[in-house]
Structures are given as structure tokens and as C-alpha cells.
């Protein structure tokens, strides 16, 4: 049984980790950390866990964490980088859901996140945790940087085309929409009900922190520089993400066949039939990504949907854990989408 600890257990991604791990046959949560709620019963904060979790919150410095086989960090950026070293030294595996280890160049990271990266040595050893791209590296990793939600949706849309060297890598447009849970569980005027209800708005246009992260991976896949225009939008729903990615084809190829062949062995990526377009509700509460494709002459639109706090965060983190421990990557992640 894999002994699990979660640091930052009261955020949305921390709660989602608890929900999913509760049904994992090979994992047991032994430590849930929260400085604000230390000593408080988990079920007092989250009544939905009554009957499932019988733990109290502990401080992130509690010795119980050193009994874990793996620790998930579901913390704001800047926390994990200064905390994970002590656990790695003891042979404990780390999966970081923050952005601390996603960007390989520390100066680039500091530019986008506004603070100095203090652990550039660890950046070199961190593996980017997108199983559909780096599964073999994840299997041998001790420190995994769990991807952001937007990069996950964008990269899965573009990977088959980049591998086939079939698109213009400088004219890509990524138009993305995310549910409000992507902003986290904190006090923020911009995400209050009255601010987001019955409204749709773009934000951080082409300046979102997820852009350099996605660019880094796309460039690695293509083996050439990749650039794209990125417009994220906030939509008035809790969970879900839709990425509509527009590209110019440089080859006359059967894109439907390309995508189906490329993802045929990937458990959680499903290419829809011609003329069928993905919808967020189909993947709500799951680790799945649905992909729809529309071609018009040399123009192609790839549409991907994911649950932003499942495949876009916690579900993907558990998929990574499964790979790191050499077990079936789908364990604990076989949920059907929540309908209606």
C-alpha cells in the first residue's frame, strides 16, 4: 500500500486528491496538511468526506510526512521549492501541483512568477508530468512537476500534429475557456459569484504564466521553436476547460486518422468521430480528455475538453503517481463523467 501525504489539502486540488485517492486500491492517505486548520478534523472543513476520512489536519512540518512514500504538494507557487528537498533526501517521491518545477530555466520562471527560484538544481531533475508525452521519464522520476490545466489541454491538441511535422509552428492560436475553480479556493473579488455569473471575460491575454510552460513542451515535441497566441477566458461554471486551437496545415494529411492512431494506446485521451465536437460535461469529474477536429482546406481547428481540476490537476497527479510506482496508470481514475 502506497502511503500518501498531501500538503495544501484544503484547496480545490487538495480536496480532489482526497476524493480520488479514497477510491484508489493501492494507496492510503496518512497525512493531510494545513497550517490554518491544524488540529481540526478534516470532516469539519469538508462534510462531504464524512464516513470516508478519519484524520485531523497537521502542520506541514509534522514527522508523519516522513513516513510517506509519496507527497503531493497542492500549494501556491514558491512553497514546494523550499520544502521538497528534505523529503527527496529521505527517498520520498514528490508530485508538485504548483508551477515551481515546470519551467526548466530558473530565470524564465522568475520572470513570469515574480520571485527568485531558489532551487535551480532541482529544476534539472524534475520531470514534466504529462504522461501522454513523458511516460517513460515519469516512471523513473522522484520529482514530478504536474502540468498546468491550460498547457495540458493545448499540448494534447497539438502533439500529433507536431510529431508529424505537419503544421506551421509560428501561426498557432489557442483560444481557451476555464471554469472558476481554476482560480483556486481563496478570496478574490474577480471570482465572486456576482462578478462571474452571466459573464464571460478574457484575462492575461497572451501573458498568462502557462504560456512559457506550454511553449517549452511544444518546442521539445517539435524539436523546433513553437510559438502561439494564447487567450484564456473565465467562464461562469465550476469545473471544465475547453481549448480551441487553430493551426495552418503544411501537409495534406488525414488528420482524423493521425489523431486516432497517435492516441490509440493512451488510456485517457479519446478522439471523437468526424463531426462530433467535445463538451465539458462529458469529462466532468474524470481524468479524460476528449478531442474533436474540424478541417477546412489547409486550416484545422482542434478542440479539447478536460476537467481542469482532474485531468488538469489532481487526476493527472494520481496518474503520475501510478506510473512512478509501476502500477496500472488508471488505478483510482476510472470515473464516468458526471451527468447531468
From Swiss-Prot:
Membership in a protein family: Belongs to the NAGSA dehydrogenase family. Type 1 subfamily.
Native source organism of the sequence: Ruthia magnifica subsp. Calyptogena magnifica
Subcellular location: Cytoplasm
Keyword Oxidoreductase among UniProt keywords: yes
Catalytic activity, reaction form: N-acetyl-L-glutamate 5-semialdehyde + phosphate + NADP(+) = N-acetyl-L-glutamyl 5-phosphate + NADPH + H(+)
Keywords: Amino-acid biosynthesis, Arginine biosynthesis, Cytoplasm, NADP, Oxidoreductase
Record gene name: argC
Coiled coil: none
Gene3D superfamilies in alphabetical order: Dihydrodipicolinate Reductase, domain 2, NAD(P)-binding Rossmann-like Domain
PANTHER family, sorted: N-ACETYL-GAMMA-GLUTAMYL-PHOSPHATE REDUCTASE, CHLOROPLASTIC-RELATED (PTHR32338:SF10), N-ACETYL-GAMMA-GLUTAMYL-PHOSPHATE REDUCTASE, CHLOROPLASTIC-RELATED-RELATED (PTHR32338)
InterPro entries according to UniProt: AGPR_AS (IPR023013), AGPR_type-1 (IPR000706), NAD(P)-bd_dom_sf (IPR036291), NAGSA_dehydrogenase (IPR050085), Semialdehyde_DH_NAD-bd (IPR000534)
Protein's recorded name: N-acetyl-gamma-glutamyl-phosphate reductase
Cross-referenced SUPFAM superfamilies: Glyceraldehyde-3-phosphate dehydrogenase-like, C-terminal domain, NAD(P)-binding Rossmann-fold domains
An MF annotation (GO) of this entry: NAD binding
Any one annotated GO CC term: cytoplasm
UniProt-annotated catalytic positions: 149
Pathway: Amino-acid biosynthesis; L-arginine biosynthesis; N(2)-acetyl-L-ornithine from L-glutamate: step 3/4
Its biological purpose: Catalyzes the NADPH-dependent reduction of N-acetyl-5-glutamyl phosphate to yield N-acetyl-L-glutamate 5-semialdehyde.
GO biological process: L-arginine biosynthetic process
EC number annotated for this UniProt entry: 1.2.1.38
Paired cysteines (S-S): none
Amino acid at each position: 500500500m502506497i502511503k500518501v501525504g498531501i500538503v495544501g489539502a484544503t484547496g480545490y486540488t487538495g480536496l480532489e486528491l482526497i476524493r480520488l485517492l479514497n477510491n484508489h486500491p493501492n494507496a492510503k492517505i496518512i497525512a493531510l496538511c494545513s497550517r490554518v486548520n491544524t488540529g481540526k478534523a478534516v470532516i469539519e472543513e469538508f462534510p462531504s468526506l464524512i464516513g470516508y476520512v478519519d484524520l485531523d489536519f497537521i502542520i506541514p512540518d509534522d514527522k508523519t510526512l516522513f513516513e510517506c512514500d509519496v507527497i503531493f504538494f497542492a500549494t501556491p507557487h514558491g512553497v514546494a521549492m523550499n520544502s521538497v528537498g528534505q523529503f527527496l533526501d529521505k527517498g520520498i517521491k514528490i508530485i508538485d501541483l504548483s508551477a515551481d518545477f515546470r519551467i526548466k530555466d530558473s530565470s524564465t520562471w522568475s520572470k513570469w512568477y515574480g520571485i527568485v527560484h531558489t532551487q535551480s538544481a532541482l529544476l534539472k531533475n524534475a520531470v514534466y508530468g504529462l504522461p501522454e508525452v513523458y511516460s517513460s521519464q515519469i516512471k523513473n522520476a522522484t520529482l514530478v512537476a504536474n502540468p498546468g490545466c491550460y498547457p495540458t489541454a493545448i499540448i494534447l491538441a497539438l502533439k500529433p500534429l507536431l510529431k508529424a511535422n505537419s503544421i506551421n509552428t509560428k501561426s498557432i492560436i489557442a483560444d481557451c475557456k476555464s471554469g472558476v475553480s481554476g482560480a483556486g479556493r481563496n478570496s478574490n473579488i474577480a471570482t465572486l459569484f456576482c462578478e462571474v455569473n452571466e459573464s464571460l471575460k478574457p484575462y492575461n491575454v497572451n501573458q498568462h504564466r502557462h504560456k512559457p510552460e506550454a511553449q517549452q513542451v511544444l518546442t521539445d515535441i517539435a524539436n523546433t521553436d513553437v510559438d502561439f497566441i494564447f487567450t484564456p477566458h473565465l467562464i461562469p461554471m465550476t469545473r471544465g476547460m475547453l481549448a480551441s486551437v487553430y493551426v495552418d496545415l503544411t501537409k495534406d494529411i488525414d488528420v482524423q486518422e493521425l489523431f486516432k492512431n497517435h492516441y490509440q494506446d493512451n488510456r485517457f485521451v479519446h478522439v471523437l468521430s468526424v463531426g462530433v465536437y467535445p463538451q465539458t460535461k462529458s469529462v466532468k469529474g474524470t481524468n479524460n480528455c476528449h478531442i474533436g477536429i474540424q478541417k477546412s482546406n489547409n486550416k484545422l481547428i482542434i478542440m479539447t475538453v478536460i476537467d481542469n481540476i482532474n485531468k488538469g490537476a489532481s487526476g493527472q497527479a494520481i496518474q503520475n503517481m501510478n506510473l512512478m510506482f509501476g502500477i496500472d496508470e488508471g488505478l483510482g481514475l476510472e470515473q464516468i463523467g458526471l451527468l447531468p
